Amino acid sequence: MPSFRPNISNDLDTIIFECNSNYDTIVEVTKWFLQIAYLIPGGILNILLLYTILFKNSEIYASSSFFLIYSTDCFVSFSMIFLDIIGRTLVYFTPLCPIIAPMFYEPLIGFKIMMIVLHHSRACKSLIQILLVVNRMSCVIYPIRYGKMWMRPLKYLIILVFVIPFSIDWNLIISRVYMQPTFGGIYMEYIKKVAWASQSRFQLIFITIALLFTIVCTSVIFYTLVMLPKRLRNVERTLSLGTAYISMSFIILVVFQFLFAFYSDIFTTSTIFGYSLLSYDILNVGSPIIMHCVSSKLRNHVLRGSRKLSSAARVVPVSNVTSTNGWVNLIVITL
């Protein structure tokens, strides 16, 4: 299907489009239903994890830099899922398109903000990923100093997670955002004021850096854990599951961001657009599921709502951690 090309002389011109009626309504609505069926539970799970870590059981998790970083990821993931639910409804719930299309001919302020927040959040995800893998690596390399080493600069690092992505928002802020026909519905697009400053290329830079950090840090983690005694192999297996998932997710993201960055004219309105949306779903929905599976203590707190910990569940202060046992405790806490 050819790309939609708006023909305007200034940013205030009306952009008129028609919904594509070639798509089967039943098929498109089924796509919408299937995606909403996992996006809503995924959003709820992110909120539950965020609430458990920061509020309900904060006395347990507030001493773990890993969980504080991960709670930031839960917040960003929920924000993206919330916006994605709106976006997927516009794209796939095709009966709405002919009804609401005339509402989107004029310049879009609300959806421009939505698009900025969505791209900003995607960059945040890459930065959070870097913090998570570096945090885990430092945990196994410096088990004694790990806690103090992270807690001091952590609040500044989290602030930077939200501040740094503003460096790539500027072109989107000054550009015209409009709706274009996408599948049987509509979706947001923008007319770049600065031609070279593509959001997809900016995102590709962030994601590629995050992927490199993931590969290097997890390689160091695996090498270090292999050196541990045999009785600690269960920890290695659990960590392998999480890191393998993260690596796979970012490889998928890199592939789709590469296609959009350099072949956007070909792929913007094709099926690959839908796959690119799903690639972020893998991160936003899959990540809390993985965390829910690998951390039995966190899972119990989320599901059972218990505020009390047995001695085995309590986070061990860094000052009390010694020798190999301390190493294991810190690794288990971060998982």
Swiss-Prot record:
Keywords: Membrane, Transmembrane, Transmembrane helix. Pfam families: Srg (PF02118). It is found in: Membrane. GO terms for biological process: sensory perception of chemical stimulus. SUPFAM superfamilies: Family A G protein-coupled receptor-like. One of its GO terms (cellular component) is membrane. GO terms for molecular function: transmembrane signaling receptor activity. It is a multi-pass membrane protein. The keyword RNA-binding does not apply. The chain crosses the membrane at residues 33-53, 66-86, 98-118, 154-174, 202-222, 242-262, 271-291. InterPro entries: 7TM_GPCR_serpentine_rcpt_Srg, Nematode_SR-like. Its main location: membrane. PANTHER family: SERPENTINE RECEPTOR CLASS GAMMA-11-RELATED, SERPENTINE RECEPTOR CLASS GAMMA-RELATED. Belongs to the nematode receptor-like protein srg family. This is Serpentine receptor class gamma-11. It comes from Caenorhabditis elegans.
